[in-house]
Amino acid sequence: MYEFHPYFTNDGSVGLYSTDFNDIYHSATGALTEAYEKFIYPVDFNTFLHKDKIKVLDICYGIGYNSKSFLNFIFENYCRKNFSKKYSLTKRYIDKIHTNNILQLLLGNFIYKNSICNEQIYTDNIFDKISITAIDNDKILSYISPFIKTGVRNFKNVNIDFKYNAIDKFINNKDKISHPKINELINYLIFEKISENSNDFTQNEELNRLINNPTFSQYFDSNIKGIYKSYRYKPYKNNPRRDYLAILHNIYYRYLSKRYKKRLKRYQLQDINFKLKNDDARKVLLEDYNLYNLIFLDAFTPSKCPCLWSYEFFKLLNEHLEGDGLILTYSTSASIRAAMVVAGFEIGNIYNERLNRFTGTVAAKNKNQIKYPLSEYDLGLLKTKAGIFYRDENLNSLNGAINEARKIEVENSNRISSSHYKKYFNQNH
């Protein structure tokens, strides 16, 4: 049975806990906020979007916050702002299905025509040049991604079935972070793309069990769930009443799906190339020959998942990065930064304006792309024992073996410890 341990982070987006890694997938202060601040805001979109092709590699896709934030940011800040106002579009919504509005659904094509513009009038299409390759070895988790809610208000973290001390102070914190949510159209886009390219998405029983579990209902979008159910619908034999209700359900959600499809076409969002790869990222990239403009590296912490933080893995990423591309990650570990440098990257800090401090690392081939270089102290830290990086010579080692090898190397190293280095640096500066 698949283990699923969700909770609400302080910005109203869903965070997850992994029993396998005894770690959280996202910052408890705000899962969606973290995605924006570490993977979206550091990118110069005004320059970036002038490229003929935009290829994004999302490593450890999870429930998709980084890819969805990327698409949502472009959609809200470039597409919708530049969309022609030639036609007046009236928003109209129908109530959830009841017996008193089923005829309106059956006969009311005029609702559909009035609520959606039938013509594509946005001439500068950004989305047809965007390609996203999302990698995660947890297929069920990535299948859940389009169902996940964001921007939930007045939420309560009740019935949490795990204990993780590091987040207790955050999930019980009354101070919430204000942040925009992912537009429902982006979630529907991801739903459609996964459905189109995954053979078992709509018929996966484990996924079906999870999204229909009442315990988790507060975390999932009811509209996406309804559309999903309409894809799975089968008549109930010998039960006309249930069959009738299912038919009503399908009429409503198929209408809703058509409405979403119209909006995708209107903004040309359907032109995005989205590929989901459910496998070991090392294996996927060894068989991949694409060059990427942006790489989001969002694996579990280096000590929990060192196979995706090794020197050899960064060498592999170097081979897959465009000359003016960027790698973005939340990690500021000296061992990770040292591995990046030896792998041929220029590295710098990711500045968090809200917190007024550095909260991540950016790597590039071009030094001119580094806006916030490392300080003298940080550069010196790379030469201490803390800067000894992980090794995975054949890119197929287990995490335990990689950790053990680094532990032995650190123990046998003549390098100064990070604590002694800090003391020495403070005395001389």
Placement of each model-derived feature along the sequence:
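Conserved beta-strand signature within the Rossmann-like core of class I S-adenosyl-L-methionine
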Residues: 324-331
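SAM/dcSAM-binding transferase cores
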Residues: 2-5, 361-429
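Class I SAM-dependent methyltransferase Rossmann-like catalytic core
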Residues: 3-51, 65-77
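A short acidic, Gly/Pro-enriched loop at the edge of an enzyme's catalytic core
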Residues: 286-294
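A short glycine-rich, Lys/Arg-flanked "PGG" loop and its adjoining helix->strand segment in the class I
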Residues: 308-323
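Class I S-adenosyl-L-methionine-dependent methyltransferase module
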Residues: 69-275, 282
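Conserved class I S-adenosyl-L-methionine
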Residues: 52-64
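Conserved Class I S-adenosyl-L-methionine
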Residues: 337-358
